[in-house]
Amino acid sequence: MKIAMLAPVAWRTPPRKYGPWEQVASNITEGMVKKGIDITLFATGDSLTKGKLKSICPAGYEEDKSLDPKVEECMHISFLMEQAHEYDIIHNNFDFLPLTYSRLIKTPMVTTIHGFSSPKIIPVYKRFNDINHYVSISYADRSKHLKYTANVYNGINSSHFTFKEKPGDYLLYFGRIHHDKGTREAIDIALKAKMKLIIAGFIQDEKYYNQHVKPFIDGTQIIYTGNAGPEERDELLGGAYALLHPINFKEPFGLSVAEGMFCGTPVIAFNKGSMQELIDDKKTGFLVNNVEEAADVIPLVKNIDRNYCYQWAQSKFSTEKMTEDYIKVYEKVLSL
């Protein structure tokens, strides 16, 4: 079985800091390498893999602003499609644009749908549904307009995270600084609970940051540490009393939620999107509806078994499980 793994080219694969789709593409690729699968990663030229790497884009366009995103994406996708005949399956982690090549190649394409950026893109998925094999990353994110081959939860490389039996004394917000992710709500929760909050993540919305986040940062109770790399992410997640995830949108999957539980850290999340699938309510954290409810459950976090958080994450969101699930998808597609 020869697999071509198509990663995005906004960031390096795996990303140095932020880059969730690139991270998932990397985790799948390295999982396949461990299984002895012949896999080639199509990503930026500075990407890292134990498999084969092919690239036409030198670096991520979000890291090198001299690169034009549309040009890099078109070059990258066509670079793979010109070689499609060399592979048994193309695994698309690049959203909808590669689908438009589906009828021009003979190689079957598996597409992991990492959420819908807008309802406006669904017609593209609908048009190519008959020739593509769609995989959802949570049942909550499925569109009623599409047919799916499987659901495969994102897998986390547990070796990158350290289980901590004893919690620290701070709350953690880990994610991009944006209204969707609820940075301001996390601040409000911490203020109500009278606990220290560490905010880690890149500023995606400068206006939102300046209006709703920056005024509260005092370096004592509310601390902003910037965008965190792998080592700092592990340290922050493992040392937290609880991870706050007060999202304002139906999130397809929250990588930081799973990562936190691998460290043994309970998660307090707004009950939207995939959160019911990620969190075992009252056992690995709490599903709440608003800031007040989140603040109210913070004293109860001490009753959560951090070892159970780890075991739950390992059973559902490990790279090993994700790899096995995708191998089943590949085998199913090739048997058709």
Predicted feature locations:
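Catalytic cores of nucleotide-sugar-dependent glycosyltransferases that transfer UDP/GDP/TDP-activated
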Residues: 1-336
